[in-house]
Amino acid sequence: MYKRQEDNLLKLDMLGHDDPTMIRMLEDLTGVNARQIPLDDPDTMSIFVSSKVLGFENDELLGPTGAVAIPEFNTRFTRGMLMDTLPKDFNTLVRLSGFSHGTDVWLGNARELIVSGTASVLETVGCRDDIMLYLISMGLDPKMSFKIMEAVRKGKVKKGGFQEGWVEAMQEHNVPQWYIDSLAKIGYLFPKAHAVAYVMMAFRIAWFKVHRPLAFYATFFTVRAKAFDAEYCCAGMDAVKQKIREIENNKDATDVEQNLLVTPVSYTHLRAHETSA
């Protein structure tokens, strides 16, 4: 609704973030300085593809990855993205963050290019900066590269097409046609610095999940739990699974029911940690 009135309204995006609070609590509980956590820790990186390092694999409710309860990668949508791309490094996670925060960047665009084998993850456009840097690397004039990036990331190319001479310039410098077509589909692109900040925070939290699990779960339920039912959480894995299915199958589930964080609770049972009231 606001997009139809945005030229006449002052809109303030005042976003709250729980992640810094989680980091502080995790540091207090463990004595680990989060800023010293290596962003290439192999065990932590592995949970974005598999849950094996957590002590279980391919759970029927949690799926194949270990990314549940990790910021940026906690939704079914982003976990599906992980399975389509199988990230092996931090740079790829940043690209995925760009995909998820952009508009018309992943579905119907980068995903199809990656799944079909037309392009690798790092060859596709994830963040606005990717366009300018890539076009400059292909030999385009830096000023034109910047203008193309700005027009694409604001959705102007999608709405009105490329300016005269842009497509010809890209073709003259051997920019693939699939790349040009991809640019024309984009409605909005996330800035890379923002994506890097989000993924750094997510990776540090993921490190605690792998290496300091009890502190991680205690912090998660303290900071992020919008609703919590101790009765079934303490009743064992079967009760947790039953509750998950009840909520998923109930089309009239309340907001409180939707917010019951039963999935992370099932993690604690799978990893042999006891939840007690």
What is each of the regions a protein language model found here?
Residues 3-271, 276-277:
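Noncatalytic, beta-rich nucleic-acid-contacting surfaces in large DNA/RNA-processing enzymes
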